Amino acid sequence: MNTNKQFKVYTTSAVDFAQDPTALSSNINAPQFDKAIVVHVFFSQNKNLEDLQEFQLLVKSANVDILSIITTSRSTPQAKYFVGQGKAEEIAQAVEQLNADIVLVNHSLTPAQARNLESICQCRVVDRTGLILDIFAQRARSHEGKLQVELAQLRHLATRLVRRKTGLDQQKGAVGLRGPGETQLETDRRLIKVRITQLQNRLEKVAKQRNQNRQTRRKADIPTISLVGYTNAGKSTLFNVLTQANVYVADQLFATLDPTLKRLPIQDVGNCVLADTVGFIRELPHDLVSAFKSTLQETTEASLLLHVIDVADSRKLENMLTVNEVLSEIKANQVTTLLVYNKIDQVENIQPHIEFDEENQPIAVYLSAQLNQGLDLLVEAIRQKLSHEILHLEINLAAQYGKIRHCFYQLNCVRQEKINEQGEFLLDIQIDKIEWLKLSKQFPLLKRFYETTEISDK
């Protein structure tokens, strides 16, 4: 093996970074890698090829050509290379023989493992997390999306900086103050920290604006419906046919990154806001979930979630579990959810229909967004769900509970108010069930009003 192969390291100096604060993060994606060696490790006797196939789709989504796929089986990751020494040498040989630009590993590597593989392969090594971050960087179109991706990239990069010899290491002090000056590593860490703080401040402003928009919709009594689901389940296609929008649709992972909001009128409910959001995936980088907090807030504070599922996917149950895990992480698992089984045209013996629970409430809709089949059933299920989730209550509060009254007015849910002879507030309110449950936890005395209403309605 030729050990003299030139190894190009892509770095950004402190000087470049000072001149352009985005240089360090944007330079992560500067080289255009076209040819890759894909590495996958099976950690069980049953070789599940679907994980590898999904990773190949991720690589395709990143616009990278796969030259070769190298697989191996292990019981546990090896500490130094993640794969064994022999397999690492095999990967290095493949890189040289096929003239690959990059090695893509379908697992999360420690910084040390990535550096060791880079050293033996003499090319850049990117793990699953890095690849997903790169795809997000390519797809981000809005200003907010670009800020969020940059923040996630910098957080990921901060753990992977290594010491390297530069001129800054040679700085010396005067008499009595001798010693090395600030190293390049220290400089990069400091500048990354500064840039992360800048991005967080900017995103806080964006988050405030989003929150104001949500408050405005809430005061106008406009429900928000958020599309969630595993990536490539057909959320954007469904969004387009429901709202006559023109959101980018493609048969690839993470085709949609920036959230889109459109008006959706629902009979007996009125105008709603439908939100198309980024898809989820197994092992979604935590840095991304954290960076996209303001975007995902649309999901957290929605009136209804439409969990879109690719019914033709053999791993749909695992995908649903992954989505539910992310929803729990962002604290959206308590939001009322309607399951939407999409792509029924790709399976046999399934017709468009609504599935109901024991209380005759819709829990799932089967449809094909691509063929416009079952969309009327979905709209009807949404109507029933939202009608059921909006509470109409009559509340009487003693004068000392003015704080509760103030909360109702803040939510703009008071339709009418009177004061009786005892000085009690008689409130006629219309409130989202989720908001009511939140208030009931804060003020337990409210629970009796909802229970009384449920009994009287039966």
Curated annotation (Swiss-Prot):
Residues of the Hflx-type G domain: 223-390
Protein name stated in the entry: GTPase HflX
Disulfide links within the chain: none
Gene designation: hflX
SUPFAM superfamilies, alphabetized: EF-G C-terminal domain-like, P-loop containing nucleoside triphosphate hydrolases
Organism superkingdom: Bacteria
Similarity comment: family membership: Belongs to the TRAFAC class OBG-HflX-like GTPase superfamily. HflX GTPase family.
CDD domains, A to Z: HflX
UniProt keyword annotation of GTP-binding present: yes
Cross-referenced HAMAP family: GTPase_HflX (MF_00900)
Classification lineage: Bacteria, Pseudomonadati, Pseudomonadota, Gammaproteobacteria, Pasteurellales
